[in-house]
Amino acid sequence: MGRAAPGPDEGAEGERPSISATALARMERNRRRALALRQARLAARPYPQAAAGAGPPQGRDTGGGFFLEEEEEEEEQRRAAERIVHPPAPVLQFDYLICGDCGKEFMDSYLMQHFDWATCDNCRDAEDKHKLITRTEAKEEYLLKDCDLDKREPVLRFIVKKNPHNPRWGDMKLYLKLQVIKRALEVWGNEESLQEAKEQRRDSREKMKQKRFDKKVKELRRAVRSSLWKKTASIHEHEYGPEENVDEETYKKTCTVCGHELTYEKM
């Protein structure tokens, strides 16, 4: 007799079909291969992907079947620029200055730079001809006013230096003496008028000085006279001489020191 087919309860309770060892080995190989591929991708790209919009570096199609990277393109441009031959620049004609003393040409100098005075450095005489004077000396010696130095065109140029006598004082303004003399002649017309004005001012100063001196002497004499009078009046005692009979009952005595007369009656 044949064996009867198992019922539903018997099928559920029976054992499930087992996986073969070959299938398990294949699954393990696939898992390891997937891990190896993942690690390879991470090793090739260790940093996170850049933000959107930052694509790979752009290249230039050379038309020869390959792209030229940016660095290679810059190097090629540099080499091309080195191969360019520029024509020589034309020779420039400079506007040379003519020294007013020696007549030679020069490019620049101390007096030209600071005072716009055409004299080269070789001819500069800082101790005599091209001497610098202070603003006070320019006003007193050449009778110039502030407007003559600061407002009259062209305005005189100057340099500023520390006061050598005391650094705490204000800075000095130094002018070129030649330019100050030229400005004084423009103001006064000629040298004779300047000398006359200087003599008049000198005489006026002498008169004012003498007047102040006389006033002080007068005040001193008055003070001395007043002190002597007070001293004499405070300590003088009359020394009368013999009395004289002026009238029947009137007599007088005279001080032998100051001449004071004392008149009195005697009964």
Curated annotation (Swiss-Prot):
Keywords: DNA damage, DNA repair, DNA-binding, Metal-binding, Nucleus, Zinc, Zinc-finger. The gene is XPA. One of its GO terms (cellular component) is nucleotide-excision repair factor 1 complex. A motif (Nuclear localization signal) lies at residues 25-46. This is DNA repair protein complementing XP-A cells homolog. GO terms for molecular function: damaged DNA binding; zinc ion binding. It comes from Gallus gallus. Zn(2+) binds at residues 99, 102, 120, 123. Belongs to the XPA family. InterPro entries: DNA-bd_dom_put_sf, XPA/RAD14, XPA_C, XPA_CS, XPA_sf, Znf_XPA_CS.
